[in-house]
């Protein structure tokens, strides 16, 4: 599937693959190594990604649970239905809610 195609993706029936302990992803389109890409990502309850940055801008919409975000400006709980844009190169910490984790759509 290319970016020019009509794409329908259902997170309830998507096939997720473990990326690292506490994180699993389901690619919708693109290439996660070469970019750009989009997919569903799950953070296990209490997952801690630590401080990091991304090469490109990351756009995400939380679908279930809560994505925990923190940078020098403070901490934000990004809940179901919320949108977050993280600029490429911006150092931040992220994680999943301690009880529910997080399910979100992510695009670069």
Model-derived features: where do they sit?
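Conserved hydrophobic/aromatic beta-strand scaffold that supports enzyme active sites
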Residues: 25-27, 38-42, 59, 75, ...
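Conserved short histidine dyad/triad with adjacent acidic residue
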Residues: 29, 34-53, 87-91
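Short acidic-glycine-tyrosine-enriched beta hairpin
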Residues: 32-33, 67, 71-91
């Amino acid at each position: 599937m290319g970016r020019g195609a009509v794409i329908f993706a259902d997170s309830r029936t998507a096939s997720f693959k473990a990326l690292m302990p506490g994180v699993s992803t389901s690619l919708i389109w693109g290439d996660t190594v070469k970019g750009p890409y989009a997919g569903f990502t799950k953070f296990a309850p209490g997952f801690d990604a630590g401080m990091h940055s991304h090469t490109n801008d990351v756009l995400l919409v939380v679908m279930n649970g809560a994505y925990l975000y923190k940078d020098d400006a403070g901490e934000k709980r990004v809940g179901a239905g919320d949108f977050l844009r993280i600029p490429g190169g911006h150092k931040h910490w992220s994680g999943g809610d301690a009880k529910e984790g997080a399910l979100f759509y992510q695009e670069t």
